Amino acid sequence: MDQKASYFINEKLFTEVKPVLFTDLIHHLKIGPSMAKKLMFDYYKQTTNAKYNCVVICCYKDQTIKIIHDLSNIPQQDSIIDCFIYAFNPMDSFIPYYDIIDQKDCLTIKNSYELKVSESSKIIERTKTLEEKSKPLVRPTARSKTTPEETTGRKSKSKDMGLRSTALLAKMKKDRDDKETSRQNELRKRKEENLQKINKQNPEREAQMKELNNLFVEDDLDTEEVNGGSKPNSPKETDSNDKDKNNDDLEDLLETTAEDSLMDVPKIQQTKPSETEHSKEPKSEEEPSSFIDEDGYIVTKRPATSTPPRKPSPVVKRALSSSKKQETPSSNKRLKKQGTLESFFKRKAK
């Protein structure tokens, strides 16, 4: 028994390098715990050359149990009730290792009764019942109905969508053009109304505009006679040319401001109001009278001076300047305008 125990301990402690517990001896040698403790103590006494650590468990009177690794320092030795070697450890730190062991044959208490395991009742297997396989009914195959493919419909839809998109774009463009034309027409109407109001308020200006228009028309007729030479024009062409020229002259006159139009009036019309003003001034100087007041002050009475002519309102200037910006005449109109102005100044110089 001692040889078996020592062989088992050496094998596990030095070859496998695992700790040996006293419970390992109980399971391996099938002995009781007191016998296992005795064998552990005998092995500790006999083997003095080998190096290993001994783990001891001490039971004290105050019902405390301590695991001691250092045998040289055992505390409270007088109060120890029981002490035994718990394990041999080949390493410094104690890590218990437990093997899986079948403990059916290692019972500490034995009796005359034997354990019997009842045999498991056999499971009666159910016989397989054969199911009748239903034969599929064979029916005559009917010809499938042919239907048109959906791809054509999809293609036509995509084409329709494309046509709709172009139509929508065209409609939107037309609406925008209509709005723009209506806006331009409204602006033209407003300009014409403003010009008519200005002409009604200032009849002198309207007369001046007519005179200027007649002068430009006469100059244009003279230039046409010089350029035309021996080529007589038909009455229809002359009428149409006169209308176009009149329209061009009116557009040019509309582009000029009120001050510019007044600058183009002949000198005779400008000298007349200046003479009248000079004639009025001495009268106004002769009219004031003076008399001596009760307090001895000289009091002079003068008539109220005539109000100076009003300048054209800024609204009119803005309307005329906006008409200048919006109406951009072509190169032909500019040439005509330059020609008429040159002829006008030549006549004026003569």
Curated annotation (Swiss-Prot):
DNA polymerase delta (DNA polymerase III) participates in chromosomal DNA replication. It is required during synthesis of the leading and lagging DNA strands at the replication fork and binds at/or near replication origins and moves along DNA with the replication fork. It has 3'-5' proofreading exonuclease activity that correct errors arising during DNA replication. It is also involved in DNA synthesis during DNA repair. This is DNA polymerase delta subunit 3. Residues 320-332 have a biased composition (Polar residues). The modification Phosphoserine is found at S230. The keyword Cell membrane does not apply. GO terms for biological process: base-excision repair; DNA amplification; DNA metabolic process; DNA replication, removal of RNA primer; double-strand break repair via break-induced replication; error-prone translesion synthesis; lagging strand elongation; leading strand elongation. One of its GO terms (cellular component) is delta DNA polymerase complex. It comes from Saccharomyces cerevisiae (strain ATCC 204508 / S288c). One of its GO terms (molecular function) is H3-H4 histone complex chaperone activity. Residues 131-350 are annotated as: Disordered. DNA polymerase delta is a heterotrimer of POL3, POL32 and HYS2. POL32 can form homodimers. The keyword RNA-binding does not apply. Residues 249-262 have a biased composition (Acidic residues). Residues 146-162, 172-195, 234-248, 274-286 have a biased composition (Basic and acidic residues). Present with 2410 molecules/cell in log phase SD medium. Its main location: nucleus. It is found in: Nucleus. Keywords: DNA replication, DNA-directed DNA polymerase, Nucleotidyltransferase, Nucleus, Phosphoprotein, Transferase. The modification Phosphothreonine is found at T223. The gene is POL32.
